[in-house]
Amino acid sequence: MAGRWMDLGMFNARGLAGADALGIAIEQMVTGIASPVDSERGLAARLRYLTKTDAGYEAMDRAGIHVSPRTLMAWLAEERSPNRANLARLDAAYWDLRRRNVATDLKHRLNSNGHGTRVEINPVDQTRVDGRHQRDLSSRSLNVRGIWDRAVDAWIDDDVQELDAIWDEIIQDLGSEYDAYSNVSSIGWAA
């Protein structure tokens, strides 16, 4: 991570690390079942999605769902309902599988046939910072290409260090004031 803003809140500036903002922005591209897991419809949809493929069973295993086939069949037939802990695990498994399933599409959309994606970077919020400590920062936008496959893979793997390295590559294109954008209030794009 770039250096001078390591102690972000020292003068009451508010924001988050660029790597975190990058992960959040990718996460916001993932859509799925809107019904809550504890609703009849939400549970049924998640169970159908998870039991359709071997990858779904692997996602349930990663989420810590270790029930007998008989119990799983009872859930699918709506004869029994999972307890709260298993509902949370089912939801986690669903979103884990959903992320993995949409990764290829995300890479395709963000790479945009080699054209990349225009990213808007909003600087840290300095409204609470005393005037003498404020920096003159404006929203910046730049076209980002060549990093999206790595970024999506790092996001899937929850690899914060790799996302941080990617963010540093992105902000290098901002020129001499890149360091001021190591922390941001938000980033966004339309992909």
Question: What residue spans do the PLM features occupy?
Answer:
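DNA major-groove recognition helix of helix-turn-helix/homeodomain DNA-binding modules
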Residues: A85-R100
